[in-house]
């Protein structure tokens, strides 16, 4: 059905936010067009939202500069987070013992792609019907 050939990618490595906290935010923007995704990330009050917004802007810049794509026709094709390093820290407890704290990091990958004309037309028809 969908035949996207042109796509741009941006990766943020070793982000010091736990992957489960990042997943809450990336689930909000998956499949959205760029303007909607930027609006969602701007007004989301999660700690991962500014990091993902910066990553989205980087992917859009890669698409417009390297591939000469129009940013108005782009959408978030895929976005996922992988677990990065775990920094192990010791938290002091009673009687000279200690507990291990694992500070988790994330690797976030975001791919934007050009929608084909049929999908763009369906999206515009759907938005007109909702208004």
From Swiss-Prot:
Segments passing through the bilayer: none
GO biological process: translation
GO CC terms of this entry: cytosolic large ribosomal subunit
Disulphide bond pairs: none
PROSITE patterns tied to this protein: RIBOSOMAL_L22 (PS00464)
CDD domains on file: Ribosomal_L22
UniProt keywords, alphabetically: Ribonucleoprotein, Ribosomal protein, RNA-binding, rRNA-binding
InterPro entries noted in UniProt: Ribosomal_uL22, Ribosomal_uL22_bac/chlpt-type, Ribosomal_uL22_bac/org-type, Ribosomal_uL22_CS, Ribosomal_uL22_sf
Alphabetized GO MF terms: rRNA binding; structural constituent of ribosome
Family matches, as Pfam families: Ribosomal_L22 (PF00237)
PANTHER family referenced in this protein's UniProt entry, alphabetically: CHLOROPLAST 50S RIBOSOMAL PROTEIN L22-RELATED (PTHR13501), LARGE RIBOSOMAL SUBUNIT PROTEIN UL22M (PTHR13501:SF8)
Family, per entry: Belongs to the universal ribosomal protein uL22 family.
Quaternary structure (record): Part of the 50S ribosomal subunit.
Function description: This protein binds specifically to 23S rRNA; its binding is stimulated by other ribosomal proteins, e.g. L4, L17, and L20. It is important during the early stages of 50S assembly. It makes multiple contacts with different domains of the 23S rRNA in the assembled 50S subunit and ribosome.
Descriptive protein name: Large ribosomal subunit protein uL22
